[in-house]
Amino acid sequence: MVVELKNIEKIYENGFHALKGVNLELKKGDILGVIGYSGAGKSTLIRLINCLERPSSGEVLVNGVNLLNLKPKELQKARQKIGMIFQHFNLLSAKNVFENVAFALEIARWEKNKIKSRVHELLELVGLEDKMHFYPKQLSGGQKQRVAIARSLANCPDLLLCDEATSALDSKTTHSILTLLSGIQKKLDLSIVFITHEIEVVKELCNQMCVISSGEIVERGLVEEIFANPKHAVTKELLGIKNEHGDQKCQDVYRIVFLGEHLDEPIISNLIRRFKIDVSIISGNIEELTTKDIGYLVVRFLGSTTETQRALEYLNALGLQVEKLKD
């Protein structure tokens, strides 16, 4: 495991219980989206991973090493393998792009003759090789975040922490940053933890996700599995799953989930012909995830109890997820 958080509790001096019994694992190469509402404990959690915050109790293991047991110099060295980017970029305004990236290498005591080539390599990676002499005030928000990404990768980390890294960006720039991170992850075989309150970020970038609420992880798993079958009320709210049946009563109203391979199949029309049952489509949509697409239909079966039961058995036999909606 790249990251293991074990039985984490975080209680601040004012008595606020920010994290409660948190257990979390991250495997090599995974991109984990941690999502939740403001004040849920997301930023506290990510700052524990590199010990910018220390837990009240529990263990923080990165690559098998408990960071809480390290001496200050040992912790500083371990942090060099953990990159981090923030919502507001944290660039040095008095230094240009080249100098901002080089600064991370200077702190790590790289040899001067190696710093120049490494900075050029990093700026090429993030598409800013033509901006190396620009200062932060001359850059757009997206360009500033690219500089921050380059700086975070300076010491060849195997783990990248992103704390609301796209929250200050517009949707087009957010997409370009997520595309960049996805490409970098594949090229460098990084593991990424991405804190966000934006479900679109999870959809576009992540293969794993966890939902945090009031300091607790309430749901954790593959992105497509949670999108297909969310269990916790907070997860359903974040995914926008609420009152899909409108003002209609829920008698014989069902939510059907279509995973990847079934999206292009005429399943509903086949069901109507095969079982001589009428189907009223109340709502539907398709979620495009980074791993696979998922389709949803909310339908009402208009037929006898026997016909409805046969239709449900048919859908279950196809491996579709079918949930009867409640009032």
From Swiss-Prot:
Bilayer topology: Peripheral membrane protein
GO cellular component: plasma membrane
Enzyme class: translocase
Segments forming domain ABC transporter: 3-239
Catalyzed reaction equations: L-methionine(out) + ATP + H2O = L-methionine(in) + ADP + phosphate + H(+); D-methionine(out) + ATP + H2O = D-methionine(in) + ADP + phosphate + H(+)
Compartments where found: Cell inner membrane
Disulphide connectivity of cysteines: none
MF terms (GO), sorted A to Z: ABC-type D-methionine transporter activity; ATP binding; ATP hydrolysis activity
Keyword DNA-binding found: no
Pfam families the record matches: ABC_tran, NIL
Chain coiled-coil ranges: none
UniProt keyword Transport, yes or no: yes
Binding site for ATP: G36, Y37, S38, G39, A40, G41, K42, S43
Source superkingdom: Bacteria
Keywords recorded for this protein, A-Z: Amino-acid transport, ATP-binding, Cell inner membrane, Cell membrane, Membrane, Nucleotide-binding, Translocase, Transport
Enzyme Commission code: 7.4.2.11
Function: Part of the ABC transporter complex MetNIQ involved in methionine import. Responsible for energy coupling to the transport system.
Summary of subunit composition and partner proteins: The complex is composed of two ATP-binding proteins (MetN), two transmembrane proteins (MetI) and a solute-binding protein (MetQ).
Family indicated by similarity: Belongs to the ABC transporter superfamily. Methionine importer (TC 3.A.1.24) family.
Name of this protein: Methionine import ATP-binding protein MetN
Organism from which the protein derives: Helicobacter pylori (strain HPAG1)
Taxonomic lineage: Bacteria, Pseudomonadati, Campylobacterota, Epsilonproteobacteria, Campylobacterales
